[in-house]
Amino acid sequence: MAEEQAYHVNKGLECIKALRARPLDPLVVEEALAAWVETSEGQTLDRMSSDEAEADHQDISKPCFPAAGPGKSSMSRCHDQGLGGSNSCDEELGAFIGDSSMHSTEVQHYHVYDHSGEKVEGVEDADSILVQSGADDGVEVWGGDEESENSDVDSGEPDPEGSAPADWGSSPISPATRASDVETVEGDEIQKLLEDQSRIRKMTKAGKTLVVPPIPSQERPTASEKPIKKGHRREIDLIWNDGRVFIDRWCNPTCSKVTVGTVRAKCICGECPRVCEQCITDSGIENRIWYHNLADIPE
């Protein structure tokens, strides 16, 4: 199909090139237009039959379309026939312009022909394949052709392999009740499902009741529920100076952040003791300056 289309396109381009090389005589065009006006005025609707249109198209399709196939080479009749001869394409194009069916607003009938000029069989059958657009309600879909419908196989009986018969048809449903029925059914089923789930939750079985512990309250603990007081951690700092090492030991509250350097931190939780067994004997414990963080330490 693609080769035939390419073949016709090439031949059409050859005709266009020939017309550009030798344009039509203006007198021929005027005579063709005058003849068309005379025929169109006296024409009636009864003369616009399909047989006449088919005959007109047969006469038109002969000049510029050669009888050779896509694989054969042939010269178009649109070329000149010598210096003294007349251009046959001019006369035929004038007849083509004079065809009133090309300017008619009525429905045109088109026919397909092969390269020999004969009508292609089976082309008109393609019109019956077209499906009319419209509502799809009440339309049944049937599979297979006439031979399959008239076959001896009964669609109602299961096949030898045991598969169940399938109904490929569709029952007509009115559009007015289709959407409402679906919504009603879905609503009833959902409501019934919710009621069943609620009834199951209320039913308790012996020995299978799930006991969920209560959520702990966010209230502050009482005096009896206070946690154990936090203690101290021992920290050591080593300082080297001219081959000598100075060791500094101290305690910091456990709740304080561990930092680099000699930092005497301050309790931030309010529950750590001031001294412990390790730092109670440290010298200058009463005069020690407690810092909360490094920013509080003077330089």
Curated annotation (Swiss-Prot):
Task: Report the function annotation for this chain.
Answer: Plays an essential role in the inhibition of host immune response. Prevents the establishment of cellular antiviral state by blocking interferon-alpha/beta (IFN-alpha/beta) production and signaling pathway. Interacts with host IFIH1/MDA5 and DHX58/LGP2 to inhibit the transduction pathway involved in the activation of IFN-beta promoter, thus protecting the virus against cell antiviral state. Blocks the type I interferon signaling pathway by interacting with host TYK2 and thereby inhibiting downstream STAT1 and STAT2 phosphorylation.
Q: Which Pfam families match?
A: Paramyxo_P_V_N, zf-Paramyx-P
Leftover remarks: Highly virulent strain of Rinderpest virus can blocks the phosphorylation of host JAK1 kinase, thereby blocking the type II interferon signaling as well.
Species annotation: Rinderpest virus (strain Kabete O)
* Gene3D superfamilies hit by this protein: 4.10.80.340
Give the span(s) annotated as Disordered. 137-186, 205-229
Q: State whether keyword Zinc applies.
A: yes
Which positions bind Zn(2+) 1? 232, 251, 276, 279
Q: What is this protein called?
A: Non-structural protein V
Here the segments flagged for biased composition (Acidic residues) are: 137-160
What GO terms in the biological process aspect are recorded for it?
symbiont-mediated suppression of host cytoplasmic pattern recognition receptor signaling pathway via inhibition of MDA-5 activity; symbiont-mediated suppression of host JAK-STAT cascade via inhibition of STAT1 activity; symbiont-mediated suppression of host JAK-STAT cascade via inhibition of STAT2 activity; symbiont-mediated suppression of host type I interferon-mediated signaling pathway
Main location, first listed in the record: host cell
> Subcellular localization, per the record?
Host cytoplasm
